[in-house]
């Protein structure tokens, strides 16, 4: 983009993409003409707890049981930390099971009607391993930003035209 002398552009992002778009806009407000964001995810602690620890578990209890089944009962107080431990384990089988559980949980809850092609992705070791490890790594490290970074800096982007689209049944990014 910089090689093509594009000075500013429109951002579009959904879920994690909305997080990245907002962070980019805060760090580079003069380069953003507008934003269209769907499924807003600010990566706040309570959003992570809602989805990975409690909350969404009440809506999808059967899928949540599959998700937590790879974590021993005595290690479930902080599921993100426990998953991080298993996702970074040297034990490849343990790591693969944790990655499949993490990925299946997210893909099973990200659509109103369960999609077989999504569930199939969670059974692909290379996809699940990369998806779960990258996502969990960012979450365990607070996406490498201070708490509530986006909300604390929203004044920087208040003049950027922004459209927000939010789904009624969005469980991942309520």
Q: Locations of the language-model features?
A:
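Conserved acidic catalytic loop of the alpha/beta-hydrolase fold
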Residues: 1-10
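Conserved alpha/beta-hydrolase "nucleophile elbow" surrounding the catalytic nucleophile
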Residues: 9, 13-15, 167
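Short glycine-enriched nucleophile-adjacent loop
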Residues: 18-29, 35
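A catalytic-pocket lid/entrance helix-loop region that shapes and gates access to the active site
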Residues: 30-83
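Active-site nucleophile elbow and catalytic-triad environment of alpha/beta-hydrolase enzymes
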Residues: 137-154
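Conserved alpha/beta-hydrolase "acid-adjacent" motif
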Residues: 146, 171-174
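Short beta-strand/loop motif that positions the catalytic acidic residue
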Residues: 157-158, 164-166
